[in-house]
Amino acid sequence: PKTELQKQIVKLSGKLPALTEKQRRWGIMNAMDHVGLRLKKGLITCTHCGKIFYDLMKLEDGEMDICPNCGTHLKIETTTRKSCRDNEYFNIITTCHGFQVFRYFYIRKEFHSGKEASYCIREVVQNWMSADGKFKTMALLANMHSYYRDAWCLGTDLEIRANDKEAYHIGCDACYPVRRYLSAWKKYGFKGKVHSIYALDFFRLISTDSTAETLLKAGQYELLRMFCAGKGYEIKRTWPTIKICMRNNYVVKDTSMWFDYLDLLGDEGKDLRNAHYVCPDNLNSAHDFYMERKRRKEEKERRQRDMKQMEALKKYEKEYEKLKSRFFDLNISDGNIIIVPLKSLDEFRQEGQIMHHCVFTNNYFRKKDSLILSARIGEKHIETIE
């Protein structure tokens, strides 16, 4: 530690309570995915307690069962394996002398058939955040490159590390349910929930970015999740429209559909600051309505392009007939499959559309030394032959 703040954090870190047995047990049971190793004859080995029991329910792989010995929920896997290893994380959110502290614990599990699983749990990262959103990181030394998340040097100590190293940013879903928060967060609109956002990112953004703070206070949790997920550019781009929604107490619940809907409105030239358009009573219906309008418009434009293209290519129609008309009566059949030549540009276009290839768009009718035929069974086109 070099600065007074760093020295203070190091001192306070040493005063944090050790992991309790209750917290340890919670992490093992809730952060880890426990597997039931099932043999083909139906015997299941619990990879937590090591006991063996019979599969009475004939479960599919991936379905859950409960070990009758220890009560652990097991994901069933049919295999001949007799051992397994796994790594996972859980975190504890607490406070210490005016800091919001995020403590991350690394769990390493090793299991061998006939024995109980062994677990190694080590605290690997601490993020110390002040009420202004600035934070310092204490962590163990991480091996290899910055993007290796599980290569910890478990023999090292927690020390002040660089905030920007990817290994120290742990996206952890398992969060111990007993949490303590700074009262300072209330002024940013925090009411006890982080709304499925990683807590470190959540508090950092609401305290340093007025956009995130406004979204939280307005109850726009889906937009806030999108903002915290690195899509702030979309929020900034449509901020005037979002403000109209907030002014009219309209909550965006499906961000993907709503932003797609805004793009459709933009294509129609609609006013994106008009609540009548941007705050629909039924987003699904409004989205489908404008999607259908766009589809019809594109279909009309496509037909116009095709007509213009056909007009431009009409000059090749007579040339094609002159060169290939001698083959137009050709009919090859085995009684089931019929093979006939394409006789006009319209037939080339239809063949390309039906078979989804480029026989028309790449002007195969202009090839002087080739004949294009269509193989069919009844009305069904099955192959195009050159």
Indicate residue ranges for each PLM-predicted region.
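Short metal-binding segments enriched for Cys and/or His
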Residues: 72-88
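Cys/His-enriched microdomains
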Residues: 42-47, 65-68, 371
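Cysteine-rich micro-motifs
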Residues: 59-76
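N-terminal alpha-helical interaction blocks
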Residues: 1-37
